[in-house]
Amino acid sequence: MNSPAEPRCIVSLTYDDALPCHFESVAPLLEEHGLHGTFYVPCSQGFFDNAESWREVATQGHELGNHSVFHPCHDQAWLDEAYNLRHYTARRWSDEIRLANNILTLVDGRTVRSFGNTCHHNIIGSGATASTVAKLVPEFCVAARGEHTGKPVDLKKINWFNLGTRGADQATFANLRAEIDRMCVRGGWLILTMHGVGPRDHNLHIAENEHTQLVEWLAARQDTIWTAPVRMVAEALKPSRRALAQAAR
């Protein structure tokens, strides 16, 4: 489904951490049903090991979103302390995001993409030196998925650099369908965050059958629900981006 003139009901399917299931089964499933997603890929060893597979994902129309290089987060038990956002400066974070953008451009040839906040965190540093992703990311990306809010984006007051997302790991199709149906009554943009699809690649995951049902349902409703990558939605809805796109036609 192409961008409608005034989209009212939007869904973005986003997948984190460059997992093998994403290019092996998720992207092909979306393509089979005429849909595209955003894959937020950290530009670390796992990504480099499968660079050609990710290039093919991008070639098929999916977004490769910036998800940093080292996946820094705040105070996670599994986190290498060297990559604790508490210890980052604004410059260090900016340098890492710039590097990730450059790497992704080498893979997909694109210079415009969205950012997926690692662990949904928005704070860089701590105390008096703290900054926010929302303040820094406009230099690098057209939009940022932002913090976990558990609700749709209000189309009347969009914060482009802290959009807000709903985690869909462990979610059921029935619950997601009900949420989307409610959103479509009043209008909105639901950005769903998933890690694994099935349990193979990540302890955070949505069951494969629940995910397949969601994809099939969205594909059957492309006349009323616009399912699109975050970058594509931003380019369609942001006035400055829309003007550039129209001028290029």
In which residue ranges do the predicted regions lie?
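Amphipathic, non-transmembrane alpha-helical secondary structure
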Residues: 23-32, 51, 55, 59, ...
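Short glycine/proline-rich turn/loop motifs
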Residues: 4-8, 78-83, 198
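Short, solvent-exposed loop/turn segments at secondary-structure boundaries
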Residues: 42, 126-128, 202-206
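Short, surface-exposed alpha-helical recognition segments that flank or form part
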Residues: 14, 88-92, 202, 206
